Amino acid sequence: MKGSYKIIVQNSNVRYEFEIRRNITIIKGDSATGKTTLVEMIGEFYENGTSSGIELFCEKTCSVLSGRNWKAALDTMKEEIIFIDEGNAFVYSTEFARAVQESDNYYVIVTREGLVNLPYSVEEIYGIRESGKYAALKQTYNELYHIYGEIDFHEKIKPEKVIVEDSNSGFEFFKGIAEKEECVVISANGKSNIFEKVLQSTGEEKVLVIADGAAFGSEMIVWSSF
């Protein structure tokens, strides 16, 4: 599967409308924000269709994966958008990560923890919030929002230290640039080591971190507590 897919799921009380853009989407947030309700509605429609009182609009099949038999169930799912609620421990396993990489499905995973085995983007971590778009209706409208937004820099960045994720061509490239500016460049030798390298810096240093945001999502739970 490639591309983005719009999903609308609703009943007489609540409506969710959002777009899935990549193969792994993470939904985070506190209790009572509508995460489990969303997954339950997807599952109810998948099992019972419109007789459930739920309407779902998407060009791809939306389904729910859960329980100890997840692998057998996943083997039968092809080109689907698969929702996984909190409490399914298999999402943390290397076996699940391998199955995701080998499949042609999209995955929407509800979790409050980082999934270190999965390469998901910082830009595909969302929360759920109520929107005033349908404020005149009794139906509550919910939408997804980016938890980690983009920051536009309007001033020149002048770091004293640059921490680069890799130790190969990326490191050599930025080292060559930074040496002209009398700036120290070090390699973290992997995304999981970046946070430790930042902690080793003095509090007065201006530090710039260069990492692949498309695979850095699982590390954000550490950074959000920093």
Task: Please tell me what each predicted stretch does.
Residues 1-16, 136-140:
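N-terminal pre-Walker A segment at the start of P-loop NTPase domains
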Residues 88-89, 122-226:
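Acidic, divalent-metal-binding catalytic cores of TOPRIM
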Residues 83-85, 104-114:
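Structural recognition of the conserved hydrophobic beta-strand(s) that form the central parallel beta-sheet
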Residues 31:
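The conserved Walker
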